[in-house]
């Protein structure tokens, strides 16, 4: 963004030039200071306008311009305009390197790394943050070193978190992570530990609290839930020490999440209640709804379905107030499960239909399929559906086309309502990284998203066929037979004779179509067969010589003229006025600050690892809402269990020997799963 070109100082008399530039410098600095004041007050949008005006005016003071770039980048970052933030942080980095400002280069590298992290470019972000760390260590800046360690930990944490959720979408059990994901999260933990050690040495309690919180979150993703609770308790203590209610609320919520995976549901409920209380003090309705959602699911695990329904209703009301359709749909799904567990299928059907409607509106295909199955089951139980197969088949066909495996609809009646009873029992698992089996007597419920130990017994457990069971078809067992559009037949003898005759006559015309060359033309062709290198450059359409060395000489000669075009021009920086004084400064200090070979080798190394990531499109992003918690472990469990729905259902045999008896005995103990 180039501003209006000011008069050149050499074109004006000396005193006039000095007065003009003095007024412009004062104007630029005043605008920048006002923008800084507004940003500190939280008015980033107006602050950006003042900073942009300062850039339009321009300045010849390189330090001032670098500070403006840094502030503009930070302001755009807080406005979530990360593309503009990246642009100005790059300007800041280039200018700092040009003038030889090592501390400015370190800060610009850190800001650039944070912006790249938010954009999901984790490998590039790690390179920038590592450069921040190396310069801080070189300059003996302990505070900058601590910040760099924290930023590198954040980069690996964000990358590991994204990879771990992708692994969960692939039915990877929580805590059982692929080696690359575990390695990434362990790196994050290592840098957080180094940061914690350094800020303890510096006596920075606030930074210690942040390190403890992030260590707890990292160990939570690694499945080390006991260690996670230890770190979150430290975070909670420091938050109380500073009176930081928001951090205290986050610590309580994280402690609740970890205790759910430890199987200590009663302890988790107490932490969630404190989260709810603090969210009301902070007047944050979205966080209040998240706490109600977590409490509702926790009381479902405790088999207190009345209280679970109460909290889910609160979640539903707040989601409706905030127009959060995703949260509304999840609340309706949870309420349907709760009312089924209480033996009230009529109310459950109402919420299941509402869940189906919302899932269709927001385009949640998985939620829509789950809702259709729940509606079909409840209608069968209530005797309201006469032909379930005919009514559900057209709807499920679309899912089969999308690649989803259709789920079998059970033939239920009022007499077999007790088959929906799923045992649920909490077994405390001590310091284990995952919860154990939760089995025991329970009231009626649709399958709930609860973890199963049998799912963790081994990677081959799911593939082993069960004797006597009717396992559903897998996609690998399905073969699509495409009918041929035509049947090949052998050509007749007449056709063969025709083609032979055609080939014979056509071949005799080949030489007639060639262009004969006379002696003069042949000599000219020989003369131009090996043109000089200069001729080749002047005539790019000429064919290259087969000689390898000349070919590469041609490439080198052509490419050499483009090197200067690829260099960064300092004069293109917005707001920079180049004068005789700072032009010499730029020339004097710019060249030695070019990044070395080690930096580019590291950059190439990290860039090369992203090639495979660019080959396939990212998975579909599940819809999220403000009233749904970020660490929605119940959704995680639901995704893990989603492909096991058919294995958790009970097949009703249709043999005559069971016609007069009660419901048949299931061949497999039903485990709680996603509905």
Swiss-Prot record:
| Start and end residues of each stretch annotated as Interaction with STK11/LKB1 | 364-487
Recorded topology in the membrane: Peripheral membrane protein
Which PANTHER family does this entry report, sorted A to Z?
Answer: G-PROTEIN-SIGNALING MODULATOR 1, LD33695P
Q: Which residues carry this modification: Omega-N-methylarginine?
A: 421
Q: Where are the TPR repeats?
A: 28-61, 66-99, 106-139, 146-181, 183-202, 209-242, 249-282, 289-322, 329-362
Family per UniProt? Belongs to the GPSM family.
The yes or no answer to whether the keyword Nucleotidyltransferase is present is no
Q: What is this protein called?
A: G-protein-signaling modulator 1
Question: Which segments of the protein form a coiled coil according to its record?
Answer: none
Q: Which residues carry this modification: Phosphoserine?
A: 413, 445, 469, 471, 492-493, 545, 569
Keyword Membrane set for record: yes
Q: Which GO terms describe its biological process?
A: cell differentiation; establishment of mitotic spindle orientation; negative regulation of GTPase activity; negative regulation of guanyl-nucleotide exchange factor activity; nervous system development; positive regulation of macroautophagy
Please list the residue ranges that the record marks as compositionally biased, kind Basic and acidic residues: 424-442, 454-469
Tell where it localizes: Cytoplasm, Cytosol; Endoplasmic reticulum membrane; Golgi apparatus membrane; Cell membrane
SMART domains documented for this protein: GoLoco (SM00390), TPR (SM00028)
Instruction: Give any Gene Ontology cellular component.
Output: protein-containing complex
Q: Share what the entry says about its subunit structure, partners included.
A: Interacts with GNAI1, GNAI2 and GNAI3 preferentially in their GDP-bound state. May also interact with GNAO1. Interacts with STK11/LKB1 and MACF1. Interacts with INSC/inscuteable and FRMPD1.
Q: What is known of its domains?
A: The GoLoco domains mediate interaction with G(i/o) alpha. The GoLoco domains are essential for the GDI activity toward G(i/o) alpha.
After translation, the protein is modified as follows: Phosphorylation regulates interaction with G(i/o) alpha.
